UniProtKB/Swiss-Prot annotation:
Key word ATP-binding present: no
InterPro entries noted in UniProt: Beta-lactam-related, Beta-lactam/transpept-like, Beta-lactamase-like_AB/R
Family to which the UniProt record says this protein belongs: Belongs to the beta-lactamase family.
Recorded metabolic or biological pathway in which this protein acts: Mycotoxin biosynthesis
Known function: Beta-lactamase-like protein; part of the gene cluster that mediates the biosynthesis of strobilurin A, an antifungal polyketide that contains a key beta-methoxyacrylate toxophore that targets the complex III of the mitochondrial electron transport chain. Strobilurin biosynthesis begins with construction of benzoyl CoA by step-wise elimination of ammonia from phenylalanine by the phenylalanine ammonia-lyase str11, oxygenation by str8 and retro-Claisen reaction to form benzoic acid, which is activated to its CoA thiolester benzoyl CoA by the dedicated CoA ligase str10.
UniProt biotechnology annotation: The structure of strobilurin A was used for the development of the major class of beta-methoxyacrylate agricultural fungicides since its beta-methoxyacrylate toxophore targets the Qo site of complex III of the mitochondrial electron transport chain and prevents adenosine triphosphate synthesis. Compounds such as azoxystrobin (Syngenta) and Kresoxim methyl (BASF) are among the most widely used fungicides worldwide. This class of antifungals are used as effective treatments against a broad range of destructive fungal plant pathogens and make significant contributions to food security.
Pfam families, per database record: Beta-lactamase (PF00144)
Keyword Hydrolase: yes
Protein name (record): Beta-lactamase-like protein str6
GO MF entry, a single one: hydrolase activity
Alphabetized UniProt keyword annotations: Hydrolase
EC number: 3.5.-.-
Length: 304
């Protein structure tokens, strides 16, 4: 039987598959004892928003259901997740940015930018619910796989600010945790498995600074790459002898070898995949099985 009301369709296709047993549209004998009623505008609890508005303003929910749904967004690989990772990646993207340089909109999402420990912008993807005396916030920090769910009654308009303040408080601790994990996974001296001569062969030194991964030494098949690419006149002469690693996806990076005044395009644009060898981009680096791979040079390194 095909549902002919929004509430029945939502129950069949969303609530039941996700196990959301605390979400509904009007109070009934089963859920009445769990409904939070404000002292002001209390009548809105009993309003039936009908099919026209039930999907946008007439749904009640519980903190437990918010958490269940948020977990599927934070980890699309969970068995109960309805949306695969590639859909989530495309969905959680800004569509338009406002002139304040702090707020943006996406497909459904209300996006606010905060700063991490290194003054870099971090996007918080939110969906806020506001009635006369009901407030809700469903907010996700995508990069850190961390979310905040908040429900309250009352007419105060501080719910969204409370959620953002939680993110701001947590951000420094998440930054430190991430930096420690990144150091454990990637930082150090990488060399050929049987290499004994430190002046020949191939080796890479990777460090973590200001929350980013950097290559401070890059020798491939006996050639000091950084002494060539970072001191070329076309790149503005001698520059800092280190290059950043730009994350593409899990354990895969591009070396940001950069471009200088000789090009008129954005440096990040022209720095990507500027050449190929052996069928691979020359700036491609990836980690697999505890080894560092630079396929364009045919080099596989282990950490010393």
């Amino acid at each position: 039987m095909i549902p002919n009301r929004w509430r029945d369709l939502a129950r069949r296709d969303i609530f039941e598959p996700l196990g959301l047993n605390g979400s509904y549209f009007i109070p009934n004998a089963h859920n009445r004892a769990h409904v939070a009623v404000a002292s002001k505008y209390s009548d809105e609890v009993d309003i039936d928003f009908l099919d026209v508005m039930a999907c946008s303003g007439g749904q009640m929910s519980s903190l437990s259901d918010y958490i269940k749904l948020m977990q599927t967004f934070l980890d699309p690989t969970l068995p109960q997740s309805l949306l695969p990772a590639h859909i989530m990646r495309e969905w959680m993207t800004p569509v338009f940015g406002f002139n304040d340089d702090e707020t943006e909109v996406g497909l459904l999402w209300e996006i606010v930018k905060i700063q991490d420990s290194y003054c870099r912008p971090v996007r918080v993807y939110e969906k806020n619910g506001v009635l006369g005396a009901s407030r809700s916030v469903f907010a996700i920090h995508r990069e850190m796989a961390f979310g905040v769910a908040l429900l309250n009654t009352g007419t105060a308009t501080v719910t969204g600010n409370i959620a953002l303040e939680i993110f701001r408080i947590m951000q420094p601790y998440l930054d430190k945790l991430q930096e420690r994990k990144v150091k454990e996974r990637f930082a150090g001296h990488w060399r050929l498995p049987l290499q004994t001569n430190a002046t020949s062969g191939s080796m890479v030194d990777i460090s973590v600074s200001d929350g980013s991964l950097w290559i401070t030494r890059l020798v491939l098949n006996g050639t000091d790459v950084l002494s060539l690419t970072e001191a070329m006149p076309a790149f503005g002469g001698a520059r800092s002898r280190r290059v950043a690693l730009w994350s593409m996806r899990r354990d895969e990076f591009r070396m940001v070898l950069g471009a200088g005044a000789a090009t008129s395009c954005m440096s990040s644009w022209t720095a990507m995949d500027s050449g190929f060898s052996r069928g691979y981009p020359m700036d491609l680096v990836y980690f697999k099985g505890g080894r560092l791979h630079i396929p364009s040079a045919g080099v596989v390194l282990v950490r010393a």
